[in-house]
Amino acid sequence: MSQPQYKRILLKLSGEALMGDAAYGISPDVIRRIAHEVAEVSRMGVEIALVIGGGNIFRGAGLAAAGMDRVTADHMGMLATVMNGLALQDALEHEGVYCRVMSAVKINQVCEDYIRRRAIRHLEKGRVVVFAAGTGNPFFTTDSAASLRAIEVGADIMLKGTKVDGVYSADPTRDPDARRYELLTYDQVLEDRLMVMDATAVVLCRDQNMRIMVFDITSPGALVDVITGQRTGTIVERGDEL
């Protein structure tokens, strides 16, 4: 097997990535496959942190738009990410991988509080760390949480696993002429409003020079291929590096 290209990564997954073909919840087959691939990468010596969204269980923004208090809705969304984190922890432990779920909101009987130094120590010991409950603050997405945690723990790159193999100029499922980008700058993403992550997350990565790769997590073996450099998605980085 090829050697890993990174020492420490942060993998961002949407909650929807856990649904598979279902309309709601967690697909056992999907979460087992993801856990197997994460375990395979971990055994290569790569330190892995993850942030998972909660949209497969609850979408706070949707209910807020329908009239629910936004702060309450966002808190409910944070709890959904804890549920996903616990599910992934269980799947990883079935793979024989030590895993810790660390929450940005206190829920001590279920998982650890997020403490940066402790998280880094877990990673150094070879444990997979799942960061749950977003940033712990309303009005911030799990993409922003992923950017923040990647920077805090000193990840080499943030990998965003999606249902497409990169960033396109338009929705490739609707526009046959949509162009796939190999490389983008942070400013291009912001100026062209490309659907990589929300603007807050992109600006945070830009200001701290955290590289982003968007790739297709639904393709079996994709994570291992990305880590070993056999496959790439769309890279987002500073303009002076292109």
Curated annotation (Swiss-Prot):
It catalyses: UMP + ATP = UDP + ADP. The keyword tRNA-binding does not apply. Pathway: Pyrimidine metabolism; CTP biosynthesis via de novo pathway; UDP from UMP (UMPK route): step 1/1. It is an enzyme of class 2 (transferase). It comes from the Bacteria. Pfam families: AA_kinase. Inhibited by UTP. Keywords: ATP-binding, Cytoplasm, Kinase, Nucleotide-binding, Pyrimidine biosynthesis, Transferase. One of its GO terms (molecular function) is ATP binding. One of its GO terms (cellular component) is cytosol. Its EC number is 2.7.4.22. InterPro entries: AceGlu_kinase-like_sf, Asp/Glu/Uridylate_kinase, Uridylate_kinase, Uridylate_kinase_bac. One of its GO terms (biological process) is 'de novo' CTP biosynthetic process. ATP binds at residues 12-15, 55, 59, 162, 168, 171. SUPFAM superfamilies: Carbamate kinase-like (SSF53633). UMP binds at residues 54, 74, 135-142. Its main location: cytoplasm. It is found in: Cytoplasm. Catalyzes the reversible phosphorylation of UMP to UDP. Homohexamer. NCBIfam families: pyrH_bact (TIGR02075). Belongs to the UMP kinase family. This is Uridylate kinase.
